[in-house]
């Protein structure tokens, strides 16, 4: 990430799927300074799919002069270095992590120099919010979600490796 893009202060736009991000982009809803939040992408929700397809979208917005960033409990590949991002947020949204309490318009600051992601609004009000509830996409039914439900339920958080195996000394 180029130095001039490493600090982003902008309102959040919250999504539950990367497909919804793409639809908002195509509708022109993201043509502004924005921190795109994609929650429910962690190991316990849907197994941490690759979110690299969002890089061209966010890169286009950045190229148009907007300050943009991505915040997610999911993952991105190492080829995603153009856009500032905070990934693998833990605890993840499906487990009630702070990302599940974010709402559209929430003021955020992502500082890639210090590694900090800050909520700039009323912290007491934020902490009092009920977390959003993950609703699995019904079109995914029958594509293995049922088979791997036990593994998703047992998966550790991204910060500890997202494993569903439990060895001595593991959290």
Residue ranges of each PLM-predicted region?
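Feature captures the catalytic cores and cofactor-binding loops of soluble hydro-lyases/lyases
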Residues: 1-171
């Amino acid at each position: 990430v180029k130095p001039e893009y490493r600090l982003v202060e902008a309102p959040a736009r919250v999504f539950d799927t990367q497909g919804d991000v793409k639809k908002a982009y195509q509708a022109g809803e993201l043509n502004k300074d924005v921190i795109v939040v994609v929650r429910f992408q962690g190991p316990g929700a849907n197994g941490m799919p690759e979110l690299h397809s969002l890089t061209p979208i966010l890169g286009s917005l950045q190229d148009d002069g907007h300050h943009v960033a991505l915040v997610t409990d999911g993952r991105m590949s190492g080829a995603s270095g153009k856009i500032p991002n905070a990934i693998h947020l833990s605890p993840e949204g499906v487990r009630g992590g702070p990302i599940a309490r974010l709402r559209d318009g929430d003021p955020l600051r992502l500082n890639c120099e210090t590694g900090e992601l800050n909520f700039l609004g009323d912290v007491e009000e934020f902490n009092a919010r009920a977390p959003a509830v993950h609703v699995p996409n019904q079109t995914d039914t029958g594509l293995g979600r049922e088979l791997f439900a036990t593994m998703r339920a047992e998966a550790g958080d991204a910060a500890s490796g997202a494993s569903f195996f439990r060895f001595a000394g593991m959290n």
